[in-house]
């Protein structure tokens, strides 16, 4: 397999399953919760790495628990990280609600440090 370079985002997915979304100001019980690695670019890098490609992901993280999750995820998939660390932000996260009955989802993403990705990040790694 060849070389793959991905400019993308890592977010920690927080996925909640429930019978419905709560209304504003309401608290309801959910049926399950999963915390794991996500982000479209990161997911593509991991898939390509697991298939044997020589993969590098260009992104930004923070030095926090979710940033550590990203690095561990990529290490386990043989993905090299071309990472710049943000000192004034956080590693991104996503809230994912999954409807138990239909499987439909609703997602809110807070990209954090990844929102600081710039053209210089590409130039610095080319």
Regions found by a protein language model. Name each.
Residues 26-27, 35, 50-126:
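Conserved N-terminal subdomain of the carbohydrate kinase-like
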Residues 1-58, 68:
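Glycine-rich phosphate/adenosyl-contacting loop at the front of the ribokinase-like
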């Amino acid at each position: 397999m060849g070389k793959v370079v991905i400019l993308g985002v890592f977010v920690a997915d927080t996925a909640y399953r429930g019978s419905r979304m709560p209304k504003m100001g309401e608290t309801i019980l959910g049926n399950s919760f999963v915390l794991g690695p996500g982000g479209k670019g990161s997911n593509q890098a991991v898939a390509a790495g697991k298939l044997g490609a020589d993969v590098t992901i260009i992104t930004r993280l923070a030095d926090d628990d979710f940033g550590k999750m990203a690095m561990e995820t990529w290490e386990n998939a043989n993905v090299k990280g071309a990472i710049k660390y943000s000192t004034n932000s956080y590693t991104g996260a996503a809230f994912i609600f999954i409807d138990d009955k239909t499987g439909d989802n609703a997602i809110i993403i807070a990209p954090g440090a990844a929102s600081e990705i710039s053209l210089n990040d590409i130039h610095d790694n080319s």
